[in-house]
């Protein structure tokens, strides 16, 4: 969306129907579950506008009731797959609690990919993993202790030399901003920003982003991840 999406506030619905962009089966390409077969449920709408975001989460008109959505997930999921990833947009913008509970009741694992700024009362515990990619200075304080891993998008020349993490705003290009930093002991993943299709940055490229992410991991002990699905040219 490259920062052109409307910033939508939390949806007041009860979760018995959700606005969904798409449901698809692929390999999880990022973070702690990288390489694992997964059904992705991409929720529509986001409360932020990240200037480099290349994901379409606004073009769908599909708002299925929960039983219909569960049936579609079941139809996409082969027997070898037990992981469902809720992504966006921002999944916690909507009341995803009923969906998460239904998936856990089926014996499935659920991962939520979130920017961490919104809170929902979820069935935290075994089977549910929260992976946060901070895009702002602060996160919801109730959510922070529930986060299982942090993931940061790294671009060359845009990191803080003291910790190797982003030093520029995601909402206002070029503005210095220290994004939320992870608490001690929580796994941190760094991955290079994919600048394909974004406005050119003179003297910088995707190879530079990868080199900076790798250097950050080596110096500070983070875990480097690359977008496996993009390397394989799959969804």
Swiss-Prot record:
Identification of the protein by name: 7-carboxy-7-deazaguanine synthase
Residue numbers binding Mg(2+): 55
UniProt GO molecular function: 4 iron, 4 sulfur cluster binding; carbon-nitrogen lyase activity; magnesium ion binding; S-adenosyl-L-methionine binding
EC number per UniProt: 4.3.99.3
Cofactor: [4Fe-4S] cluster; S-adenosyl-L-methionine; Mg(2+)
Similarity comment: family membership: Belongs to the radical SAM superfamily. 7-carboxy-7-deazaguanine synthase family.
InterPro entries: 7-CO-7-deazaguanine_synth-like, Aldolase_TIM, rSAM
Source organism of this protein record: Rhodospirillum rubrum (strain ATCC 11170 / ATH 1.1.1 / DSM 467 / LMG 4362 / NCIMB 8255 / S1)
Keywords: 4Fe-4S, Iron, Iron-sulfur, Lyase, Magnesium, Metal-binding, Queuosine biosynthesis, S-adenosyl-L-methionine
Residues that bind S-adenosyl-L-methionine: 89, 133-135
Domain Radical SAM core, residue spans: 33-235
Any one biological process term the GO annotation gives: queuosine biosynthetic process
Pathway: Purine metabolism; 7-cyano-7-deazaguanine biosynthesis
UniProt gene name: queE
Stored SUPFAM superfamilies: Radical SAM enzymes
Reactions catalysed: 6-carboxy-5,6,7,8-tetrahydropterin + H(+) = 7-carboxy-7-deazaguanine + NH4(+)
Superkingdom, natural source: Bacteria
Keyword Endoplasmic reticulum attributed: no
Disulfide bonds: none
Subunit structure: Homodimer.
Cofactor binding note of this UniProt entry: Binds 1 [4Fe-4S] cluster. The cluster is coordinated with 3 cysteines and an exchangeable S-adenosyl-L-methionine. Binds 1 S-adenosyl-L-methionine per subunit.
Residues that, per the record, bind [4Fe-4S] cluster: 46, 50, 53
Entry binding sites for substrate: 27-29, 42, 87
Role played: Catalyzes the complex heterocyclic radical-mediated conversion of 6-carboxy-5,6,7,8-tetrahydropterin (CPH4) to 7-carboxy-7-deazaguanine (CDG), a step common to the biosynthetic pathways of all 7-deazapurine-containing compounds.
Pfam families: Radical_SAM
């Amino acid at each position: 969306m490259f920062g052109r999406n409307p910033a939508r506030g939390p949806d007041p619905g009860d979760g018995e129907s959700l606005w969904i962009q798409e449901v698809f089966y692929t390999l999880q390409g990022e973070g702690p579950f990288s390489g694992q077969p997964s059904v992705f449920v991409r929720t529509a709408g986001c409360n932020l506008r990240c200037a480099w975001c290349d994901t379409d989460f606004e073009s769908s008109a599909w708002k299925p009731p929960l039983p219909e959505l569960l049936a579609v997930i079941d139809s996409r999921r082969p027997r070898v797959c037990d992981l469902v990833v809720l992504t966006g947009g921002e999944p916690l913008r909507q009341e995803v609690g009923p969906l998460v509970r239904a998936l856990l009741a089926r014996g499935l694992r659920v991962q939520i990919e979130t920017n961490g700024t919104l809170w929902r009362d979820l069935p935290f515990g075994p089977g549910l993993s929260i992976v946060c990619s901070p895009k702002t200075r602060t996160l919801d304080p109730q959510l922070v202790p529930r986060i299982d891993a942090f993931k940061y998008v790294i671009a060359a020349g845009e990191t803080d030399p003291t910790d190797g993490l982003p030093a520029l705003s995601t909402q206002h290009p070029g503005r210095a901003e220290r994004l939320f930093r992870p608490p001690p002991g929580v796994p941190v993943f760094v991955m290079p920003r994919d600048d394909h299709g974004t406005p050119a940055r003179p003297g910088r490229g995707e190879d530079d982003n990868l080199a900076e992410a790798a250097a950050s991991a080596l110096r500070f002990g983070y875990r480097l991840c690359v977008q496996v699905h993009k390397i394989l040219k799959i969804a």
